[in-house]
Amino acid sequence: MQFDEEWSKADPIVHALLHQKSVTPAAWQDLFYHVYKITSWVDDGPLKIRDILTRCINDYVHEANKRIRSLQTDGSLLIGYIKEWNRFYQQANILPLPFKKIDESSRRRSVPETPEESIRTVMLEKWNEIIFMNISEQLLVEALRLVKEERDGNIIDAQNVIGIRESFVALNDRAGEDPLLVYRQSFERQFIEQTTEYYKKICGNLLNELGVLEYMVYADKKLEEEQQRAKRYLEMNSPTSGKHMEKAVIALVESFEDTILAECSKLIASKDVERLQRLYRLIRRTRSGIDTVLKCIDTHIRTEGLNDMRNNAENLSTDPERYVQQLLLMFDKFSSLVREGFCDDARLLTARDKAFRAVVNDSSIFKTEMMNKKGRTLSVESKCAELLANYCDLLLRKTQLSKKLTSEEIDEKLNQVLLVLKYVENKDVFMRFHRAHLSRRLILEMSADQEKEEMMVTKLRECGMPSDAVNKLSRMLQDIELNKDMNSSFKKALTGTNNNKSIADSINMKVLNGGAWGRGGSERIRFSLPRELEDFVPEMEAFYKKQHNGRKLCWMHHWSSGTMVFGTANGGRFDLECTTFQMAVLFCFNDRAHDKISLETLRLATELPDAELNRTLLSLVAYPKMRYQILLCDVPSTTVTARDFTDSTKFLINHDFNVVKNGKSQQRGKVNLIGRLQLSLEANAEKEHESIVALRELRVQEGIVKILKTRKTYTLAQLTMELVEILKPLFIPNRKIIKEQIDWLIENKYMERRADDINTFVYIS
């Protein structure tokens, strides 16, 4: 087979393809056939094809070069080049297809160090060598002129710029070399430099002419345009493509960053969401501008939050519901600001959390002094934890609030409580008061919904409350369930013995675990039960010991309550819900309904300590929720207090007692005298705080010993940091309590200071 004869059949098709003339499918297939025959049957066929094809390509590129050179002006030169380049670049992807066998043969035959180039590479190199290398600078200048026109607002043919970019990339794609090196050194570099120079010239004057707010509109629009421009005209695979936007941001934003950021606080204060979004879009692109925005958000939330709380302090301090709703209202407002103005940026959300935590834990408005048993104030803390616990109690107890809410609404509000609790630092105070409220609800059977109580315990566990504290709450609920079965068994055992059927039906006892309920035998109080109840106690103890041998019962009379019928000489008949102490006092009047009984006599009859007796009597002679009181006394003062009582003070039944409803007196009704059931013998909230402080001191001691036992030797800074991390779920210990407990542990030989460094501690095993 002769090469010239066979190539003469392929040559017209090759020329037609190079000159973008029409080629039929049959001719296209014939080209593959002719190439195959030459490479298979002609000696050195692949080399001969490569040589003649290279000459054809060379001739065509020279012709294209003449056509391009015939155009004199730069604009015409660019247009002519792009026209020729687009046609040629298209053929550079089509023409090599029939010659793949040539490329494969060349690869098999070539030496690895000097591989022969593919047909496509030959085409691109010829174009680069004959045309592009000689006019690339002119083309680049013209392309950048078009980009400037576009920035000025004129409409251009973007394909002219894109074609130059493609030329810089495609014509320098050589094996073993960085294909984008020439592109970066020429096109990309000059494109970025032009961007910087363009905006440097105009931005300063524009800021003065437009003002800051309107300039922000301009800068935001231009940055968006530059981002789209980069996608069109730059090679996104280039590792330095991001420099274009960096330089644009510096020219448009960072150069005037302080001026723009000066508007941030004003926009936040005025809640101008649209402009805040614009400011955020600009500043988030800068290197450090967001830090100023974070400070502005922090200052705004702290200032506005504390001002709102201060302005409503008088109403909020005594109304837990309004207090919590005020916090939630603020949280929603600040969250909305971050969401709408700053697109929920994680950094802004963190700043919101930090500032809101400061508002929640602020002690300048709603404060509680935490004192130890020596009366020394260890810290002044926010009252938020206590008010949160009180609000929980309103939702979970049978109250007007819980009755008017649906089950779903109560669930939602409990979740809101947990949301606020997340920001509370002294969570141990919340847990202490929550347990006290739970105790009252369970003992008085005032829970609105047992399932809600269990759900709340589960949620506290899920939100990270310490397991030992949550386990105690869970055990309290279990005790109540277990007591239901025990009461049923006890009533069956009591019925029919000693004519006790009536008392069996009216008795409801609760045997509670001392560890879970937080009270033990140390709180037992000397007290003489009324004769109506004293026979019941030994029967109950005997019954319990039969079922649980070895367990000891400690009667907590100050936790007990009951309902008694109260009759007056005027025919009134009322059901009084009262504590055991109130019951004991009222039973003293059973046989002396019209007599005056002195305080000293009541003390002898009940054997109550003076403080408890005075408190009980005060609840019967000056109960704030009633117009008429159960007892009257001969204290001359119009506003009776426990301090007015003396041993000679006389008390008597008020036979004119009535219940007032809707302004009308009624001689029948149910009266609740229990109020806030006294679950401990402490006289006031200060004592409760003392017990919290005492528990904190123990936890700090335990934490320090645990850390030093592991570390053996630790500096004060390291010890403090790790201790705070351990105790953070319950409370954050301050320096004062840490220092005091370190001194105590040193004094009691648990640890010692290192001889050569007083700020380094050593564990004593």
Curated annotation (Swiss-Prot):
It comes from the Eukaryota. GO terms for biological process: protein ubiquitination; SCF-dependent proteasomal ubiquitin-dependent protein catabolic process. Neddylated; which enhances the ubiquitination activity of SCF-like complex. Pathway: Protein modification; protein ubiquitination. There is a cross-link at K709 (Glycyl lysine isopeptide (Lys-Gly) (interchain with G-Cter in NEDD8)). One of its GO terms (molecular function) is protein-macromolecule adaptor activity. InterPro entries: Cullin, Cullin_CS, Cullin_homology, Cullin_homology_sf, Cullin_N, Cullin_neddylation_domain, Cullin_repeat-like_dom_sf, WH-like_DNA-bd_sf. Keywords: Isopeptide bond, Ubl conjugation, Ubl conjugation pathway. Residues 696-757 form the Cullin neddylation domain. GO terms for cellular component: Cul5-RING ubiquitin ligase complex; SCF ubiquitin ligase complex. The keyword Ubl conjugation applies. Interacts with rbx-1 and rbx-2. Belongs to the cullin family. Probable core component of cullin-based SCF-like E3 ubiquitin-protein ligase complexes which mediate the ubiquitination and subsequent proteasomal degradation of target proteins. In association with rbx-2 seems to be involved in meiotic cell cycle progression in the germline. Required for phosphorylation of the MAP kinase MPK-1 in the germline. This is Cullin-5. The lineage of its organism: Eukaryota, Metazoa, Ecdysozoa, Nematoda, Chromadorea. The gene is cul-5.
